[in-house]
Amino acid sequence: GFVFLSGLLTGMVYSRKMMKDGYSVGRDKIWSRALELYRYAMAIVLIILALQLVLPGAIAAWKNWLGDASLLDPSSLAPIATFLVQPTFMDILPQYIVYMIFAPAVIWLCIRGHWLGVAIGSLLVWLAAQLGLHRIVTYPLDAWLAGAPDEEGLRVSFNLLGWQIVFFAGIIAGTLTSMKKIEWQKVFDPKRTTLAWTALAVALFFLPLRIATAHGFMPGFVLEKFGLMEIRADFGPVYLINFAAVAYGMAWILIAGPRHENAVIRKIASTLTSLFTFNFLQLLGRHSLQIYVWHVLIVYAVYYVDARTPELSQLTKTAITIGALAVLALPALWRDREKIFANAPYVGNWMKTPA
């Protein structure tokens, strides 16, 4: 969902820029954003690696997540800087950065009316990922990086060729929306419910299967076949079909739901709209990049504490989880401090930035 929304916003924002100021201006804006993401991606890696040197036992605690990466071994940093090795929980930004590099050309093609060609190309690239064609490149690269059979080579969590279909679907939708080529009120007509019911049926079909695979209820001989279709790293067919069903269903509820004659559907639409417009969630959304970087620090800190202490009770784990969630919004609160606390007694003047 977040990958699609990122593509949607990218398409909406930068297509307007291209239509107003030209391709090169829009391209430079997108690449500038990609460079900003790269700086954040490298900053969080360097911060964690610095903490690894000063915290007792951090090397052992984070070994499975960081591998052999160390500030004391500069050669281990080059694969990270080129995204060939991505430490655990630091693999989202590299994915976005790569997509942003190609985004200007994709947006421009959509503006020029070639959105269908873009969609077909994206689908073919996704199919290539499902068939493993990317291994023609990744397997030799992995062997070269490892240098030895027992050493770690290429380390990535997401198949870029598989997940791109979600991002660029968002790009297409966002660009066409900015060009006023799509009238969403007509696309999601409350009187046209066939696709909405189909989406619900598909989601309900996969729900028990998801529970069965998550809790080990699915027989091995079934899982052997089903698992090939449910590879998250490749955004396999199960994920693509589920995403399409849920995305369509949510969009129908949010756009067509408020106009539907059924009071229950209108109530569901109202509830979801209230949830998505909740001020706290909007606050987090405005500063999602900083929240992401901060959340990586929190996760590594919690994992370090867990590794350095005896077995924690369920109550303690719950308290740690609540505490981690409580501090998650700190970067957003700090960046919006003037807006939030400007008129607050005692702290209002302190929060204001000097002119």
Predicted regions and their residues:
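Alpha-helical transmembrane segments and their immediate juxtamembrane cytosolic regions
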Residues: 1-355
